[in-house]
From Swiss-Prot:
Changing residue 108 to R: Promotes agonist-stimulated down-regulation of CHRM2 and CHRM1; no effect on internalization of CHRM2. It comes from the Eukaryota. Phosphorylated at Thr-383 in the cytoplasm; probably dephosphorylated at the plasma membrane. The phosphorylation does not regulate internalization and recycling of ADRB2, interaction with clathrin or AP2B1. Changing residue 396 to A: Abolishes interaction with AP2B1. It comes from Rattus norvegicus (Rat). The lineage of its organism: Eukaryota, Metazoa, Chordata, Craniata, Vertebrata. Its main location: cytoplasm. Changing residue 54 to A: Inhibits internalization of EDNRA and EDNRB. PANTHER family: ARRESTIN (PTHR11792), BETA-ARRESTIN-2 (PTHR11792:SF20). GO terms for biological process: adult walking behavior; cell chemotaxis; circadian rhythm; desensitization of G protein-coupled receptor signaling pathway; detection of temperature stimulus involved in sensory perception of pain; endocytosis; follicle-stimulating hormone signaling pathway; G protein-coupled receptor internalization. This is Beta-arrestin-2.
Length: 410
């Protein structure tokens, strides 16, 4: 029999190693009707804490300008959501009892570990990063979620980097289990001096939902009853990013293009299936392209389509991402014809892990010294499986140079 796999837990310590935050995951899923709760544990050195308190904050922020342009007290950043939790001393009426993971961590880490809990509102945007240009420095623009733990006498007191922990988490969405109808569109163009003859274009996709890296099959059917000749057919995939902040603006960027010299003569028909695949690897140099939030040692991808719950307040949302396929007929002597097909580009929903029920009774555990620097804790207690601790990753884009170790994400 093989060894039982451990439960992975992410950790990150303050520069002075007096404060350590533990989280069971970095990605929190928006299920439209609810969002996964943020439950973690903070471990504190009691000799260092003295008469101070331990606070944990969750912030959702939208950075819409370069960090090096923040001058004269002006910041190109808007906080969309801020929540604060006092981890120590514990509140007299905690919002909820510890989760199973928190309970296990509290037992392993000892009496100086304290739980914290946050609920992410449903109307907040998902984590999106706008791809920086080659000359851009500092933090990339976009929407991110940050957890910060620090020691202070009050929440208003300014915290210091040496005794605080900052780490980035992601709010993500996965593909719906039931996709929508097959996208299709058609249009007819009548030309002057053509004796009421027309050029008809019909296009469709084989389905509405595609996963990242999956090719799109675009079915194009042309009926040319006009006197003009279709010289070329262009198929492109465009990303649309609606920036909802002080006002709403839409930016579009082609992420895949295909051009074929397929001619359609007058009084003839044409039918063909074009295959096109939108990939980030073909768009590395495009500044402002929306990407999914990325973690260290993990390559990112084009931003997933945003699914908005019906009735949601779009003014609160930071970046809404959508995709369309555009089919264009290049006609001789002008008068091009085109249609657009909206589709959804997302990651598939991963298989849910089976959570074993908590045992009704358990033998009393013996207090043993715990080395919090260990990567893996081996125990033989039947009521608790192994926990594997992994250092929390710093948020960066692939190809970007690492900053100094005092960076808040290191």
């Amino acid at each position: 029999m093989g060894e039982k796999p451990g439960t992975r837990v992410f950790k990150k310590s303050s520069p002075n190693c007096k404060l350590t935050v533990y989280l069971g995951k970095r990605d929190f899923v928006d299920h439209l009707d609810k969002v996964d709760p943020v439950d973690g544990v903070v471990l504190v050195d009691p000799d260092y804490l003295k008469d101070r308190k331990v606070f944990v904050t969750l912030t959702c922020a939208f950075r819409y300008g370069r960090e090096d342009l923040d001058v004269l007290g002006l910041s190109f950043r808007k906080d969309l959501f801020i929540a604060t939790y006092q981890a120590f001393p514990p509140m007299p009426n905690p919002p909820r009892p510890p989760t199973r993971l928190q309970d296990r961590l509290l037992k392993k880490l000892g009496q100086h570990a304290h739980p914290f809990f946050f609920t992410i509102p449903q109307n907040l945007p998902c984590s999106v990063t706008l791809q920086p240009g080659p000359e851009d420095t500092g933090k990339a623009c976009g929407v991110d979620f940050e957890i910060r733990a620090f020691c202070a006498k009050s929440i208003e007191e300014k915290s210091h980097k040496r005794n605080s922990v900052r780490l980035i988490i992601r709010k993500v969405q996965f593909a719906p289990e039931t996709p929508g109808p097959q996208p299709s569109a058609e249009t007819t163009r009548h030309f002057l001096m053509s004796d009421r003859r027309s050029l008809h274009l019909e296009a469709s996709l084989d389905k509405e939902l595609y996963y990242h890296g999956e090719p799109l099959n675009v079915n194009v059917h042309v009926t040319n009853n006009s006197a003009k000749t279709v010289k070329k057919i262009r198929v492109s995939v465009r990303q649309y990013a609606d920036i909802c902040l002080f006002s709403t603006a839409q930016y579009k960027c082609p992420v895949a293009q295909l051009e074929q010299d397929d001619q359609v003569s007058p009084s003839s028909t044409f039918c063909k299936v074009y295959t096109i695949t939108p990939l980030l690897s073909d768009n590395r140099e495009k500044r402002g392209l929306a990407l999914d939030g990325q973690l260290k040692h993990e390559d990112t991808n084009l931003a997933s389509s945003t699914i908005v719950k019906e009735g949601a307040n779009k003014e609160v949302l930071g970046i809404l991402v959508s995709y369309r396929v555009k089919v264009k007929l290049v006609v001789s002597r002008g008068g091009d014809v085109s249609v657009e097909l909206p589709f959804v580009l997302m990651h598939p929903k991963p298989h849910d892990h089976i959570t074993l029920p908590r045992p009704q009774s358990a033998p009393r555990e013996i207090d043993i010294p715990v080395d919090t620097n260990l990567i893996e804790f081996d125990t033989n207690y039947a009521t608790d499986d192994d926990i594997v601790f992994e250092d929390f990753a710093r948020l960066r884009l692939k190809g970007m140079k690492d900053d100094d170790c005092d960076d808040q994400f290191c």
